[in-house]
Amino acid sequence: MRIISTLLLLVVCLTGYGQTSKGISGSLLEMPKITASDNVIIYTGFTVSYNTKTLIPNWVAYELTNVEVDGQFPRKGQFGMDLSFKGRQAMREDYSNSGWDKGHMCPAADLKWSEKTMYESFYLTNICPQNHELNSGDWLTLEKLGREWAKKFDKVYIICG
């Protein structure tokens, strides 16, 4: 299964490699339409569309550069609520004894280029429940691949959701 997932990802990435940012109609591709009910939060290192009904992100998007990958701020932090976000959000207690990992949507390892970005990576608005085997296995492998590509190609754009 791991090989199939990796090959599928590689095919998708290679198919898009070298294509312009124009869509089929010839118009430039744009950000998805954001409505008044969307909760888009712009952090220093990533942007998240947070779903106040499911209490997990709809998506997270960010640019990762080769310089950022080499950041020196150590992983540290404790998951907590984003007190500046006034909408309903998950709490640490939601994950207590649940059997689920608190899985970063934008990984802390991609945000080690500043103390602030590292801190923001631990907001509960940046996590979703993940099976431990997935979180520490294939998902981790995919996160590392994104960092490898950022080093190889100078920057990558990552969207998760």
Which positions does each model-derived feature cover?
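Domain-level detector for secreted/extracellular nuclease and nuclease-toxin modules, and
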Residues: 16-161
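Bacterial Sec-dependent N-terminal signal peptides
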Residues: 1-21
